């Protein structure tokens, strides 16, 4: 039972991260396969309603706020190396330098404690932003199973961002085990962080698909 639950939560992280880390702002979307996207979206909402949301309710009940906040800081800290590289590729060298310093100092506590005192919630640049800065079009809008809303460019950006995960760069033999533990926790932590916002969109929208798509392109 525990293995099955972990598998469900590992898959669910992709649904949540794609909703919480949207970086591009567009007013319209090219959605050439909307019927397919809507079918996948319905599946994702079913998964969220009957697996992730109930698990998150338990997580919020038993997890103290200070631990939730520490986990959020840790997961944001893990994005700093990739953010530094992407800022450099975009010509934002001062921002890149600050991210390197932030990551280095906070590494003393693995990001769980904000030693630098800076706002850890400020999103780091990602490869989707970098590709945008080089004039690469987003391509078609896609809704992926578990991964949620994205674009063709966003898929490529996500894959590139994954190569800069500090756990992958460390090259340890226990990376798979660490990730298997980290991913379900990240899924619950992120779903808890945006719990009310996601539920508001999901349960109070006439056309949830269109609303989630609009949010993706406007955030």
List the predicted regions and their residue ranges.
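Bacterial N-terminal signal peptides that target proteins for export
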Residues: 1-8
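Post-signal-peptide N-terminal segment of Sec-exported extracytoplasmic proteins
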Residues: 32-67
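A structured, mid-to-C-terminal "fold-capping" secondary-structure block
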Residues: 34, 129-219
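Alpha-helical scaffold segments that form or flank carboxylate-/histidine-based iron centers
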Residues: 36, 66-73, 96-104
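Signal peptide-directed extracytoplasmic domains
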Residues: 53, 57-87, 112
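Mid-length scaffold segments of soluble, non-membrane domains
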Residues: 77-152
């Amino acid at each position: 039972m525990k293995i099955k639950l972990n598998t469900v939560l590992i898959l669910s992280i992709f649904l949540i991260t794609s909703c919480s880390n949207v970086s591009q702002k567009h007013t319209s979307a090219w959605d050439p396969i909307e019927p397919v996207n809507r079918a996948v979206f319905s599946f994702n909402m079913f998964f969220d309603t009957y697996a992730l949301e109930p698990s998150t309710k338990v997580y919020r009940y038993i997890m103290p706020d200070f631990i939730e906040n520490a986990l959020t800081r840790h997961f944001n800290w893990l994005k700093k190396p990739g953010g530094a590289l992407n800022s450099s590729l975009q010509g934002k060298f001062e921002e890149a330098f600050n991210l390197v310093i932030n990551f280095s100092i906070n590494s003393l506590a693995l990001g769980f404690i904000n030693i630098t005192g800076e706002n850890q919630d400020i999103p780091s640049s990602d490869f989707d932003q970098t590709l945008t800065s080089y004039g690469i079009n987003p391509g078609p809008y896609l809704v992926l199973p578990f991964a949620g809303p994205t674009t063709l460019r966003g898929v490529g950006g996500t894959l590139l961002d994954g190569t800069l995960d500090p756990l992958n760069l460390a090259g340890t033999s226990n990376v798979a085990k660490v990730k298997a533990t980290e991913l379900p926790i990240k899924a619950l932590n992120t779903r808890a962080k945006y719990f009310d916002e996601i539920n508001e969109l999901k349960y109070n929208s006439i056309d949830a698909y269109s609303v989630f798509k609009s949010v993706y392109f406007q955030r």
